[in-house]
From Swiss-Prot:
Residues 68-77 have a biased composition (Basic and acidic residues). Its main location: secreted. One of its GO terms (cellular component) is host cell plasma membrane. This is Rhoptry neck protein 2-like protein 2. Coiled coil: none annotated. The keyword Transferase does not apply. The gene is RON2L2.
Length: 1167
C-alpha cells in the first residue's frame, strides 16, 4: 500500500519524503486532497454516486465523509452562483461566469492530452480507492501515477501497467485452422516478435462500474498518446537525430540535447531550451530572408513540427527524470518543459487524426448517438430528453425536471444500462458555455464546432493545475479533440469494439489477391472476368457502380484532397523543352559548334551532337553498355558536373574532393539530358532577351535540373502523342493495321515519345492512398464500388485538373488536346519568376497529372491495400545472394532470379498501365530508359511501405531491368512471328500429308480391283454366266500391292522426310515457346550464361593476344636499339651471339615490372 500511496502522492504534487513519518496521517491527507481534486473539481463524484448502486466505490467508512464532501461541493457551487465568481473550486471550472457540470469539464473539456491523462489517473484513484489504498484483507491492486504512465509509453509496457491496475488480461486473436497448418514456419533462431497489447482484446475481472469505465478510457487514451509520441520521435529521426522508440525517454532526451544543444561560453547546458538548439538557428526566419513564400511556408511548418517534437520529448524525459530525485536533468529548463507539456492546448488537435474523426464521421456518430440514445433512455421513460435536445427546447434549465430524472434512475441498478443512461443525460444536459455566453449541451457544442460556426479556439474553463499553483487556461479547438469518448456511449463493449474496428482497418480485402496478385495460377482472363462480374458486366451497370464509387470518394476523401491532386507533383523538366533535344534533334546543325569544348571539365568531354541522335537514344545506349559490362567505376563519368571537378587541376583541392557513388546511375543520365539542353541553349543563344517562349522555357528547365536536389528527385517519363481526330478511312486503316500488329504482339511504332521530368511528394500521395484504403474497407458491403475506387478517383482527378489547370484555354475551341503541342500562355516569357513558375507547373499538370495518378494507382495503390503481396519479393531480395548481386547486370537474366521472383517482368505485366505498356512496345528509342525510371519510381514508393530490400534492389537494378524488358518485348514479338510461320509450316505439312494419304489410298484401290467381267443370265442353268474381258485383269494381287506401296512410302519418308519430321518438332516447339513465358525467360537465362562464358574466353584470349603483341613490340624495339649500339661498340660477330638473348632477358624484365637498367649495370660491373 505504501508504494501505491507514493504514486498517489506524486500525482497530487506531494513529496514522498513525508510517507515515512506517519502512513495513516499521509493517507488521510491524500484522501482529502483526492476528494477535493478528483471528487468535486473533476466531477468523478458523479460516477461514485452510481458506483454505490452497482459496486464498491469508496470504503464503507468513507461514505459518510463522501456525502459531506458532496454536500459541501454543492454548497460551494451554490455560493459561486450567488457570490463572487472567484470563490470556490466550482467557479474555477467555469472561468468568470456561471458553472459548468464538473464531470463534463473533467472528461471532455480539456484539450491537452497529457493533462487529460492526469485527470483520468486521479479519477481512477478516487473511484477505486478501496482497491488501491484500502485497509481490507483482500489483496490490493497496484496503482501507477501519471508520471509512471507517461514515462513508460510503449505498445508493450503501458498495457501491462494498465492491465495490472484493472485486473485485466489480454486475449490473443484466435488463429484459423489454415494458419495453424501453414507450411511456413518461423526459424528457431528468429523468435516471434511480441505483439502489441493494444492489438488484443481486453478482459477485465473488475465488476461493471465507473472504475472499469475510466480505466477503459485511460487505456484507449494512452494508446493514442503512444502513437503520437512515436510520431514525434520519427520526426527527429527524419531530421537526423538518433532517437529510438524502444529506449526510455530519458535516453532520448540525452541524445537529443547532446547533439542539438548549442554551447554557451564554451559550456553546454543539458537540457537546454528550444531557442538554444541548432534547429532554432537553422530554421528561424532571420537566417534565410531570400527564400520564396512557398519555401518560407515549408520552413515554418518544419520549424513548428520540430518545436512540438522537442517539447514533447524533453517534457516526457524530464517527467521520467523527476521519478529520480538525484537526477542531474532536474532544473529550470526541465521543469519548464514539463509545465509546457501539461499546458499546451494545441496538442489536442492531433486526436482527430488518431481516431479518424472528420466531418462525415461526426455526422454519422451524432446520428447513431440519437438512435441508440433514444433506445436506451426509453427503458427508463426518459425518451423526452432526447426529444427536447432534438427540438432545441433546452434553452433553459426549467425544461429539465432533475428530480424526476433522479427518481427514475434510482429504480434501476443494472450497470449495463444505468451508467450509460447517466452518460447520455450528462451529454444532453444543458450547461453554461463561456464561448457562447449561454446555455449549450455538449452534443450541441459538437454540432456547432463541426458546423464551422466557431473557427477559433474556444476557452471553456480555468482549472487549477495539479502540479503547480499557477492557473492554466484550457481550450477546446475546432474539431473537439476527445469525441472518441462517445464511443463508450454507442458500444456495449467499447474498448474491444475499438480493437475490432482497428483490426477491420488492418484487414486485407480478399479481392485484392484475385486482382493484383502476381501469381501465375490466376490468368489475366480470370481477373478481367472477376472484375466485370463484381463491377458490372454491361456498360450501364458498370457506370452505376462507378458513380457510387465517386460518391464515396467525394464524401470521405480528406478536406483539401483536390489541392493534393495538384500539388503531389513538382515538374522539373518541361515536355516542350525536352522535345527540342528528342523529337526535333535532327533539325539542329551543331556539329561545327565548339560549345562543348568551352566547358570547364578536368578532361575533354566526349564529342557528341544532338543532331546525330536524340538524348534518349544516347541514354538507351548507355544503359545497354551498363547491362553488358556493369556500372563504370570512373569517378569523372559518375559525377561529371560536381562543383569540385570544375576548373583546372591547380585549383583542385584533393582533400575536399568527394567520392561520388558510381552506382547512382540516374545522376549520369540526368547529366546527359542537362548537357543536351545546354547545347540547345548555346545553339539558340541569339534568342536570349527576345521574350521567346520556347527559349525561356528551356532556360527554366535547365535551372530546375541544375538544382541540387533535382538530380535525385527527378524521374523521367514518356508518353506517346496520338492524333486527336481521325477520318473514317483513317480509323478503318488503323483498325486493320492494329489487328495485324496484334497478331505479332506489336503496336504501331513511334520514333519518339513526349518526355518530361517530375518529382513526387510521396507523403501527400500516400495520404490519399491510405484514405482510399480506409474507404474500400468501409465499403466492404459494396464490393463492386470498392473495386472501382481507382477508376472513380481517376475521373475525379480529370475533373479537378480540367478546372484547376484551365485546360479549356490551352487549345483552340472545338479541338482536343494533343500533348505534343505546346500549351503555354502566349505571354509566358514576359511573366515574372513566380507567375512563370506557376504557369510552368499548371501547363505540365494539365497534360500529365492524370497519367501520373494512373501510374500511381497502378504501381502503389494495390500494395497499400494489401502490402503482403510484396512480402515474397522482400524476402527474395533480402537474401545474402541477392544483396551481393545488387550491381550485377546479369542477375536479372539468371536462373535463380527468374525462378525465384522475376519481379521486373511481373511489374511490367501486372502493374504497368495499358497506355504505358503500349508506349514501351511502340517506341524505337527510350524503352530501357523509361522502364528504368519506372522501376526507380516503384523502388522509392516501396520505401514508404517498409520494404527496404525490395526498394533498394529495384533502384539499383533499374537500368538492367529496363534493358531486360526491352529485350523481352523484342523477343516476344519475334517469337510470335516465328510461331505464325511455324503454324503455316505445320499447316502445309499437314495438307501435304493428307493429300499423300488420299493419293495412296486411291492407288491402293485402283491397283487392288478385280478383273472386269461381262456377265449375262443363263436361263437353262438358272445362273449368271460371266466372261472375263480381255486386258481388264488386275496387275498384281491386292495384298501384294498394299505391301509394296507401304514399303515404298516408308522408304521414301525414311530417305526424304527426316527433315520434315525435324521441322514438325521444331515448329511445334516454336508455337509452344511463343505461349510460354517460362521457356522464353529460360532461353534468355541460357543466353546470359553463354554470354558470360564467351566473355571469359574472350578475356583470356585477349590477354594472351595483348601480351604477345606487347612482347613482340618491345622486343623489336630492344633489338633495334641493341643493333644500333652494337654497330658503335662491338664487332658484328660478338653482337650476333648475344643479341637475341639480351633482348629476351630485357623483355622479360620489362614484363615483370623490373627496371632493365639494374641487370645491365650488374652485368657491366661483372665484366
Amino acid at each position: 500500500m505504501s508504494s501505491n500511496l507514493a504514486f498517489l502522492s506524486l500525482s497530487l504534487a506531494e513529496s514522498t519524503a513525508s510517507l515515512g513519518k506517519s502512513l495513516e496521517e499521509t493517507r488521510t491527507r491524500l484522501t482529502e486532497k483526492l476528494k477535493l481534486v478528483a471528487g468535486m473539481a473533476l466531477g468523478f463524484d458523479q460516477f461514485a454516486m452510481h458506483q454505490t448502486a452497482t459496486g464498491p466505490g469508496l470504503s464503507v467508512e468513507g461514505k459518510q465523509t463522501e456525502q459531506m464532501s458532496r454536500k459541501s461541493a454543492e454548497d460551494t457551487r451554490a455560493s459561486s452562483l450567488s457570490s463572487d465568481p472567484d470563490d470556490g473550486r466550482a467557479a474555477q471550472l467555469a472561468g468568470q461566469k456561471g458553472h459548468v457540470t464538473p464531470c463534463i469539464a473533467g472528461l471532455i473539456a480539456t484539450s491537452n492530452p497529457f493533462l487529460f491523462t492526469h485527470m483520468l489517473a486521479l479519477g481512477a484513484a478516487y473511484l477505486g480507492y478501496d482497491k488501491y489504498f484500502g485497509d481490507g484483507t483482500s489483496e490490493l491492486l497496484p496503482f501507477y501515477g501519471t508520471r509512471t504512465l507517461l514515462s513508460t509509453l510503449s505498445p508493450l509496457d503501458t498495457p501491462r501497467l494498465l492491465d495490472s491496475m484493472a485486473a485485466a488480461d489480454r486475449l490473443s486473436p484466435k488463429r484459423s485452422i489454415l494458419s495453424r497448418f501453414s507450411r511456413r514456419k518461423r526459424s528457431l533462431d528468429a523468435p516471434a516478435p511480441e505483439p502489441s497489447g493494444w492489438d488484443q482484446k481486453r478482459k477485465s475481472r473488475l465488476p461493471l462500474g465507473s472504475l472499469r469505465l475510466v480505466l477503459d478510457i485511460l487505456d484507449r487514451h494512452l494508446e493514442a498518446l503512444t502513437t503520437y509520441v512515436q510520431q514525434q520521435i520519427e520526426i527527429f529521426r527524419q531530421a537526423g537525430v538518433p532517437l529510438e522508440a524502444s529506449v526510455t525517454m530519458t535516453h532520448n532526451l540525452n541524445r537529443l540535447h547532446v547533439t542539438r544543444c548549442q554551447s554557451r561560453n564554451n559550456q553546454m547546458v543539458i537540457p537546454c531550451r528550444w531557442k538554444d538548439t541548432t534547429f532554432f538557428e537553422e530554421l528561424s526566419n532571420e537566417t534565410n530572408p531570400g527564400l520564396t513564400d512557398e519555401e518560407q511556408l515549408e520552413k515554418r511548418v518544419k520549424f513548428h513540427k520540430l518545436e512540438n517534437a522537442f517539447n514533447t520529448v524533453t517534457g516526457l524525459g524530464a517527467l521520467e527524470a523527476m521519478l529520480d530525485e538525484d537526477s542531474v536533468l532536474l532544473g529550470g529548463p526541465a521543469e519548464e518543459s514539463v509545465a509546457r507539456l501539461y499546458s499546451d492546448f494545441h496538442l489536442g488537435a492531433a486526436m482527430n487524426n488518431w481516431y479518424f474523426y472528420d466531418a462525415l464521421n461526426i455526422n454519422k456518430m451524432l446520428s447513431r448517438f440519437q438512435k441508440v440514445g433514444t433506445k436506451v433512455l426509453k427503458q427508463y421513460g426518459l425518451e423526452n430528453l432526447m426529444n427536447l435536445a432534438t427540438s432545441h427546447q433546452a434553452g433553459s434549465t426549467a425544461s429539465w425536471d432533475r428530480t424526476d430524472i433522479d427518481t427514475k434512475l434510482a429504480k434501476h441498478h443494472h450497470y449495463g444500462s444505468a451508467l450509460r443512461v447517466r452518460l447520455y443525460i450528462m451529454a444532453l444536459l444543458p450547461q453554461f458555455t463561456p464561448h457562447r455566453e449561454g446555455i449549450l449541451s455538449p452534443v450541441d457544442f459538437i454540432r456547432e464546432a463541426f458546423a464551422g460556426e466557431r473557427s477559433y479556439a474556444m476557452s471553456t474553463a480555468r482549472l487549477k493545475p495539479l502540479l503547480s499553483d499557477d492557473l492554466v487556461i484550457l481550450g477546446v479547438p475546432k474539431g473537439f479533440s476527445f469525441l472518441w469518448l462517445f464511443e463508450f456511449l454507442l458500444e456495449e463493449d467499447s474498448p474491444n469494439a475499438l480493437v475490432a474496428k482497428r483490426r477491420a482497418l488492418k484487414r486485407i480485402p480478399n479481392w485484392t489477391k484475385r486482382l493484383f496478385s502476381h501469381s501465375r495460377s490466376i490468368p489475366m482472363l480470370f481477373r478481367q472476368f472477376y472484375k466485370a462480374l463484381n463491377a458490372g458486366v454491361f456498360a450501364k451497370a458498370r457506370r452505376r457502380t462507378l458513380d457510387r464509387s465517386k460518391t464515396l470518394l467525394s464524401r470521405q476523401l480528406p478536406e483539401g484532397w483536390r489541392d493534393i491532386v495538384m500539388d503531389a507533383f513538382a515538374f522539373t523538366a518541361h515536355s516542350a523543352a525536352l522535345m527540342q533535344v528528342v523529337n526535333y534533334h535532327s533539325l539542329f546543325r551543331d556539329r561545327t559548334l565548339n560549345d562543348l569544348q568551352e566547358a570547364s571539365y578536368l578532361a575533354t568531354p566526349p564529342a557528341f551532337s544532338i543532331e546525330d541522335q536524340s538524348v534518349m537514344k544516347r541514354c538507351d545506349e548507355q544503359i545497354y553498355e551498363w547491362s553488358r559490362f556493369g556500372f563504370s567505376p570512373d569517378v569523372l563519368e559518375a559525377d561529371l558536373h560536381n562543383e569540385t571537378f570544375k576548373g583546372k587541376w591547380e585549383n583542385l583541392r584533393l582533400e575536399t574532393m568527394p567520392t561520388p557513388d558510381t552506382h547512382q546511375w540516374w545522376r549520369r543520365l540526368h547529366r546527359a539530358i542537362l548537357d543536351s539542353l545546354e547545347i540547345y541553349q548555346a545553339h539558340e543563344r541569339h534568342l536570349k532577351g527576345m521574350s521567346d517562349n520556347l527559349y525561356t522555357l528551356v532556360e527554366d528547365t535547365i535551372k530546375n535540373l541544375q538544382d541540387g536536389s533535382s538530380r535525385d528527385d527527378t524521374i523521367f517519363f514518356g508518353r506517346i502523342a496520338r492524333g486527336a481526330r481521325e477520318s473514317v478511312g483513317q480509323k478503318m486503316w488503323r483498325g486493320v493495321k492494329t489487328f495485324f500488329l496484334d497478331l505479332v504482339r506489336d503496336v504501331p511504332g513511334s520514333d519518339h515519345a513526349v518526355w518530361f521530368g517530375v518529382g513526387f511528394n510521396f507523403p501527400r500521395i500516400f495520404q490519399i492512398l491510405r484514405k482510399m484504403k480506409e474507404i474500400a474497407l468501409h465499403a466492404a458491403g459494396d464490393q463492386g464500388s470498392a473495386i472501382l475506387l481507382d477508376e472513380a478517383f481517376v475521373e475525379l482527378v480529370q475533373e479537378t485538373v480540367a478546372v484547376r489547370a484551365q485546360t479549356y484555354r490551352r487549345q483552340p475551341p472545338t479541338t482536343l488536346r494533343n500533348i505534343g503541342v505546346i500549351g503555354l500562355r502566349p505571354d509566358y516569357a514576359n511573366l515574372d519568376t513566380e507567375q512563370r513558375s506557376m504557369e510552368y507547373q499548371l501547363s505540365m499538370c494539365a497534360d500529365h497529372c492524370v497519367s501520373l495518378w494512373v501510374q500511381i494507382l497502378g504501381f502503389i495503390y494495390p500494395y497499400v491495400l494489401n502490402p503482403s503481396l510484396l512480402t515474397d519479393y522482400e524476402k527474395s531480395f533480402g537474401t545474402g545472394h541477392a544483396i551481393k548481386k545488387l550491381d550485377d547486370p546479369s542477375y536479372v537474366n539468371s536462373f535463380r532470379y527468374i525462378f525465384a521472383n522475376d519481379a521486373s517482368l511481373n511489374f511490367f505485366e501486372h502493374n504497368t498501365p495499358q497506355d504505358t505498356r503500349k508506349a514501351l512496345v511502340s517506341l524505337k528509342s527510350g524503352q530501357a530508359f523509361m522502364y528504368a525510371n519506372m522501376m526507380r519510381f516503384a523502388g522509392i514508393a516501396f520505401e514508404q511501405l517498409s520494404m527496404p530490400y525490395l526498394a533498394v534492389s529495384l533502384q539499383r537494378q533499374a537500368p538492367f531491368m529496363g534493358q531486360m524488358v526491352k529485350d523481352w518485348v523484342a523477343k516476344r514479338s519475334r517469337s510470335r512471328k516465328l510461331a505464325i510461320v511455324s503454324v503455316l509450316s505445320l499447316g502445309l505439312i499437314f495438307a501435304y500429308t493428307l493429300l499423300s494419304a488420299l493419293d495412296i489410298a486411291q492407288f491402293l484401290t485402283d491397283s487392288g480391283m478385280k478383273a472386269i467381267e461381262d456377265c449375262s443370265w443363263n436361263p437353262i442353268m438358272q445362273q449368271m454366266a460371266c466372261v472375263v474381258v480381255a486386258g481388264s485383269g488386275s496387275l498384281v494381287a491386292p495384298t501384294f500391292a498394299a505391301l509394296s506401296d507401304v514399303f515404298k512410302v516408308g522408304l521414301y519418308s525414311g530417305i526424304g522426310s527426316t527433315l520434315i519430321a525435324a521441322s514438325v518438332v521444331g515448329n511445334a516447339y516454336m508455337i509452344i515457346r511463343s505461349q510460354s513465358r517460362t521457356i522464353l525467360r529460360t532461353e534468355m537465362a541460357i543466353k546470359n550464361v553463354a554470354v558470360k562464358l564467351w566473355k571469359q574466353m574472350r578475356k583470356y584470349f585477349s590477354w594472351v593476344t595483348r601480351f604477345t603483341k606487347r612482347r613482340k613490340a618491345i622486343l623489336s624495339t630492344m633489338m633495334a636499339r641493341a643493333t644500333a649500339l652494337a654497330k658503335n661498340k662491338k664487332p658484328r660477330s660478338e653482337t650476333a651471339a648475344t643479341m637475341t638473348r639480351s633482348g629476351d632477358s630485357v623483355m622479360d624484365m620489362l614484363l615483370q615490372g623490373v627496371s632493365p637498367a639494374t641487370p645491365q649495370r650488374a652485368q657491366d660491373g661483372s665484366r
